[in-house]
Design a protein with these regions (language model features):
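The feature captures the beta-strand-to-loop junction immediately N-terminal to the Walker
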Residues: 41-43
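Catalytic Walker B motif of ABC-type/P-loop ATPase nucleotide-binding domains
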Residues: 153-156
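Helix-to-loop junction immediately C-terminal to a conserved catalytic motif
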Residues: 56
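Short helical segment in ABC ATPase nucleotide-binding domains corresponding to the A-loop/adjacent helical element
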Residues: 91-99, 109, 217
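Hydrophobic anchor residue at the start of the ABC signature
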Residues: 142
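A short, proline-enriched helix->beta-strand linker immediately N-terminal to the Walker B motif
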Residues: 147-151
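Conserved ABC ATPase signature
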Residues: 128-132, 136
Length: 248
């Protein structure tokens, strides 16, 4: 790896409500290396998405700090829903982020269309979202994010709205795209299989308030696709270890 791109140092977060103070995150410490794919798993509602909001700077931690040791890091965010606008064509949807930032040029448009063609959507530029499959829509959402050339991708359960077969296929494709484009990724999910099949490391969070219970390095070749990983003995072993940790 090439050094830490992101560090969370003793990060805690409290919410103040009429009922009192609620602790959401407790003393989180971990880093993400440049070029690494890290997954965070934990029970639903444990604070995984809350952690992403701190990384993006939408909220500030109550204590501790989120740092970027190599300087400011351009980030992209991929959500559970694709949020494509139904009245815009695929090409115009993917250019939306560039439009909002007033960065649409012949060069940026050409680069974006090249990404669509490279990853199998070149024949659908004039199609509308309603004419696309769920997997195609979510892949378009990823390319919309990549069009802004982020260095760090934050993936917030990006496959959870899809059927199981599409999820498996799309995870393979998204993994390949992220590797091919040389991006760093932080995935949050409650799906253990998804985490083990895609990541270099898995961070296991406790129930709320989220603490880091365990960090597991996955001893599989970094470029092995997710579907191929699922057939290995190492996949079964890591899955069982994480499941055991979550049940404690």
């Amino acid at each position: 790896m090439n050094g830490a791109l992101l560090c969370l140092e003793n990060v805690s977060l409290y919410y103040h409500t009429p009922q009192g103070e609620t602790e959401a995150l407790r003393d989180l410490c971990f880093s993400v290396e440049k070029g690494e794919f890290v997954a965070v798993v934990g029970p639903s509602g444990c604070g995984k998405t809350t952690m992403l909001s701190l990384i993006m700077g939408l909220n500030a931690p109550s204590s501790g700090q989120v740092t970027f040791p190599q300087g400011p890091v351009p980030m992209g965010y991929m959500l559970q829903r694709d949020n494509l606008l139904e009245w815009r064509t695929l090409e115009k949807n993917v250019l939306l982020g560039l439009e909002v930032q007033h960065k649409v040029t012949e060069e940026s448009r050409g680069r974006t269309v090249a990404l669509l063609k490279k990853y199998g959507l070149g024949d659908f530029l004039s199609h509308y979202p309603g004419q696309l499959s769920g997997g195609m829509r979510q892949k378009a959402a990823l390319i919309r994010t990549l069009a802004l050339d982020p260095e760090l991708l934050l993936l917030d359960e990006p496959f959870s709205a899809l059927d199981y077969q599409t999820r498996l296929t799309l995870a393979d494709e998204v993994f390949s795209i992220i590797r091919a484009e040389g991006k760093t990724a932080l995935l949050v999910t409650h799906d253990i299989g998804e985490a083990v099949s895609m990541a270099d490391r898995v961070l296991v969070f406790s129930d709320r308030p989220a603490t880091l219970k365990r960090e597991i390095s996955l001893d599989v070749p970094g470029n092995m696709p997710p579907l191929a990983r699922r057939e290995t003995n190492a996949f079964q072993e890591h899955f069982a270890a994480i499941w055991k940790e979550l049940k404690r």
